[in-house]
Amino acid sequence: MSNVVVCALYKFVSLPHFESLREPLLSMMEQADIKGTLLLANEGINGTVAGSQAAIDALLAWLNNQNGLENIVYKLSFDDEMPFYRTKVKLKKEIVTMGVEGIDPLKVVGTYVKPQDWNALISDPEVILVDTRNDYEVQIGTFKNAINPVTETFREFPEYVKQNLDPAKHKKVAMFCTGGIRCEKSTAYLKEQGFEEVYHLEGGILKYLEEVKQEESLWEGECFVFDNRVAVDHDLKKGQYDQCNACRMPITEAEKLSPAYVQGVSCPHCIDKISDEQRKRFVERERQVNLAKSRNEAHIGSDVNQVIEARRQKKEALRQQSAEKNKAKQ
């Protein structure tokens, strides 16, 4: 049975003193052995974390006791292994970066559609269905007949709307994303641009996969997630994709057989994009990863120096203990 609980959460809420939440929140997470990243901004909180069921319950209870963070939106899934290496609480300008000033989902937002009502909406021929996620996410799974804006980051979405959508022509627009947060901003943006009927999937793809039976589902493929699972299937279990540690793109087992694939260094998606300097750095990082594995140590990217320092301190402690024992014998 999977014993690691993965919790994706967010809430748009005015947090004028969000900076003061960072230290107590980080302390709470570290004490509960919760790993992952939470973002705090003036507009709210967002992130995905993982830990034991008791730890996640404690985190949700802690957040519920903070002014403004009551009844936070969250979705749970499960994994056999911890999908994160670090514990972080970051202060940001936005909890999901669109880069457009004045977009406030607390003031105006699209119409929420429950997962059980989603199929009927997107089956309406008058509805334009838009996937608000990035291209690499869309490539491994999306809803039937959804439009892929082919964006590399969410910052590009407003330009896509400007070039491709027209409130006079597109009367009904439905949008979706992984957990719902990007749609909060994308629907708010469309409403600000004059679109009248704007809908979004409440709880995102993850909630849809949780509540809609596979035989009734209009979802095709797997859903990309921003942790070490890479993707989840319709049962919210780890999918078939791995991830290139160089470019972070999802890759299949077939792509790993390509000559362009070198573990931790390159894959078919990035082989022609990385510089010689990057390649050297990736080779060294992979060497350090393998070295850490051989010593049963956790390598966490750029934190390799911390691993080395921890090993040095351990050796120093053993040396001091040995010296004290020898001194006691004299």
From Swiss-Prot:
Domain of life: Bacteria
Stretches assigned to the Rhodanese domain: 123-217
EC number: 1.14.-.-
The entry's keywords: Oxidoreductase, tRNA processing
UniProt xrefs under InterPro entries: Rhodanese-like_dom, Rhodanese-like_dom_sf, TrhO, TRHO_N
One Pfam family it belongs to: UPF0176_N
One function term, GO molecular function aspect: oxidoreductase activity, acting on paired donors, with incorporation or reduction of molecular oxygen
Annotated catalytic residues: 177 (cysteine persulfide intermediate)
Gene Ontology BP term (one): tRNA modification
Catalytic activity from the UniProt record: uridine(34) in tRNA + AH2 + O2 = 5-hydroxyuridine(34) in tRNA + A + H2O
Family to which this protein belongs: Belongs to the TrhO family.
Function, as annotated: Catalyzes oxygen-dependent 5-hydroxyuridine (ho5U) modification at position 34 in tRNAs.
Protein name in the entry: tRNA uridine(34) hydroxylase
